[in-house]
Amino acid sequence: MIAVDTNILVYAHREDSPFHDTALRRVAELAEGSAMWAIPWPCIHEFLAIVTHPRIYAPPTPLDRALDQVDAWLESPTLAVLAESGHIG
């Protein structure tokens, strides 16, 4: 399983990124493919914080558009969101 980090999510989303085309193509391949892939929950939080921050991007991505992007990723039937389980041992 491939886990996608924050920077790849940001590059795939932000058209002004020099890595946009490559990242977008790779995330689309994962989302549309048959193999399981993952996004760690903290990376979703980081993605939202980064792309909507006005000191990082001018203009920043509007929150509703950033949330729509997250929703689109979450619609992939092969996506697993990685989070702490609370299970110890």
PLM segments and residue spans:
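Short, well-structured N-terminal submotif of metal-dependent ribonuclease cores
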Residues: 1-39, 54-69
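Acidic catalytic patch
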Residues: 15, 41-45, 71-89
